């Protein structure tokens, strides 16, 4: 797989016009985009169909479903025949919920992979301890990864710092990693919304299968330069 094929660009905090302008950029040959909760609530399935039809992009629908099993099952059923490649659910929903998600996805969106979200990249170790009493983060992540494996989930969404742990114990699970920023952004302390971050080259070396990048690509005035660096 080419390096650019492993980059998923998050279309977060963008208007329809901004999305169109970005996807029409001359050097934008990124094949995969992410539509998050905000955009999906605002524009619904029409946005998914539009991007798939007009730009032939693969689509990661990042809804992070987390509810009782029947509600998650019916929510996925409502996505029937939507042209999506990835869909997220929260691993914290437990094995019954995860199995319900996987089973319904095989029926309603059979070409879509179900990804389990571990802990949000906006949380760091101190947050996990204060919220959940977690003092051993590796053990906490492994419990979630095990639930994913038992449930038939296709992959894991986690920060790049957990990828080595995932691949060591569950190598067959895909690793999709947000929290990816260019090194100069990390060095300049411009990263505020995510705490467990890494640059693209390092994340790929750690074993990530797909990298999720947002404003580093969508809000930059150096897009062509950034694209070249991703291909090096």
Where are these regions (language model features)?
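Conserved alpha/beta-domain cores
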Residues: 11-55, 69-72, 165-167
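Generic structural signal for well-ordered alpha-helices
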Residues: 19-23, 48-49, 76, 95-102, ...
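Short, acidic/polar
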Residues: 13-25, 70-78, 137-147, 194-202
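Glycine- and other small-residue-rich loops at beta-strand/loop junctions that grip anionic moieties
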Residues: 11-12, 36-40, 68, 89-90, ...
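Glycine-rich phosphate-binding active-site loops on the catalytic face of alpha/beta enzymes
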Residues: 82-94, 193-226
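Conserved anion-binding
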Residues: 3-7, 67, 71-75, 80-155, ...
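Structural motif
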Residues: 28, 54, 82, 151, ...
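Conserved, mostly hydrophobic/aromatic
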Residues: 9, 33, 64, 87, ...
């Amino acid at each position: 797989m080419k390096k650019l094929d492993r980059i998923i660009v998050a279309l977060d905090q963008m208007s329809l016009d901004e999305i169109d302008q970005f996807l029409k950029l001359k050097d934008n040959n990124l094949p995969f985009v992410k539509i998050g909760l905000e955009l999906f609530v605002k524009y619904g399935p029409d946005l998914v169909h539009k991007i798939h039809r007009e730009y032939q992009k693969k689509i990661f629908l990042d809804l992070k479903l987390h509810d009782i099993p029947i509600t998650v099952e019916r929510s996925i059923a409502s996505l029937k025949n939507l042209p999506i490649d990835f869909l997220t659910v929260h691993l914290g929903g437990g094995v019954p919920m995860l199995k319900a998600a996987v089973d319904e996805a095989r029926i309603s969106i059979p070409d879509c992979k179900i990804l389990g979200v571990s802990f949000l990249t906006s949380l760091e170790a101190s947050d996990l301890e204060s919220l959940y009493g977690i003092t051993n983060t590796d053990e906490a992540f492994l419990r979630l990864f095990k639930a994913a494996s038992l449930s038939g989930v296709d992959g894991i969404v986690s920060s790049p710092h957990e990828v080595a742990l995932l691949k060591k114990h569950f190598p067959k699970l895909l690793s999709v990693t947000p929290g990816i920023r260019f090194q100069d952004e990390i060095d300049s302390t411009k990263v505020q919304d995510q705490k467990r971050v890494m640059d693209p080259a390092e994340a790929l070396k750690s074993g990530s299968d797909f990298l999720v990048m947002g404003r580093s690509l969508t809000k930059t005035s150096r897009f062509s330069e950034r694209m070249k660096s991703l291909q090096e």
